[in-house]
Amino acid sequence: MAKRFGAYSRETGETRVAVEITIDGKGNAAIDTGFGFADHMLNLLAFWAGFDLNLTCRGDLEVDAHHTLEDVAICLGEAFRQALGERVGIERVGDARVPMDEALCDVVVDLSGRPYLVYREDVLPPVIAGEEKDLWREFFKSLAISARMNLHIHFVYGQNGHHLVEAAFKALGLALRRATAAHGSSRVPSTKGSLD
């Protein structure tokens, strides 16, 4: 199988983002968004997925982290989709259930080409790492749309916002590792013969 690599960059009046991703990597990451908690989460995602990820962002953090995280998710999704290519010979679907101390999160992905987010967040506290909890919904929504994946995230239980979000990123990494696993087939994993 050819190297599954993608790169994407974007510059707006709010952010400047550059991403390089190798799906069949070793889980090495170099992340610098200017928002330390996001860097930590993205490092976890890369590690648990087994992706090599280089990502930089300069955003208007003096306003808040919204533009930064939204644009990071858009660019990450675009680079990931590029790396996947035609999605021939992959498992396509992956899931994971991950605890983090008192918190538990379930994540299921389908690399179907049809973007959708289901996000059950009832237990999330209103503020996580100094930002409103809705910031993470926007991140995952933007990622699902740009990567063209069906993404279900269920925060099952927990109290600590850091632990809950960390469990989600670890579970997403594991689910993506499983969904992108290559099994040697020359077929697209769909009865209709294409994923779009």
UniProtKB/Swiss-Prot annotation:
GO biological process: L-histidine biosynthetic process
Pathway membership, UniProt: Amino-acid biosynthesis; L-histidine biosynthesis; L-histidine from 5-phospho-alpha-D-ribose 1-diphosphate: step 6/9
Keyword Amino-acid biosynthesis part of the UniProt annotation: yes
PROSITE patterns: IGP_DEHYDRATASE_1, IGP_DEHYDRATASE_2
Amino-acid biosynthesis listed as a keyword: yes
MF terms (GO), sorted A to Z: imidazoleglycerol-phosphate dehydratase activity
Main localization of the protein described in the UniProt heading: cytoplasm
Alphabetical keyword list: Amino-acid biosynthesis, Cytoplasm, Histidine biosynthesis, Lyase
Documented EC number(s): 4.2.1.19
Catalytic activity of the protein: D-erythro-1-(imidazol-4-yl)glycerol 3-phosphate = 3-(imidazol-4-yl)-2-oxopropyl phosphate + H2O
Database matches in SUPFAM superfamilies: Ribosomal protein S5 domain 2-like (SSF54211)
Protein localization: Cytoplasm
InterPro entries: IGPD_sf (IPR038494), ImidazoleglycerolP_deHydtase (IPR000807), ImidazoleglycerP_deHydtase_CS (IPR020565), Ribosomal_Su5_D2-typ_SF (IPR020568)
Gene Ontology cellular-component annotations: cytoplasm
Domain of life of the organism encoding this protein: Bacteria
Family: Belongs to the imidazoleglycerol-phosphate dehydratase family.
Record's protein name: Imidazoleglycerol-phosphate dehydratase
Organism this protein belongs to: Solidesulfovibrio magneticus (strain ATCC 700980 / DSM 13731 / RS-1) (Desulfovibrio magneticus)
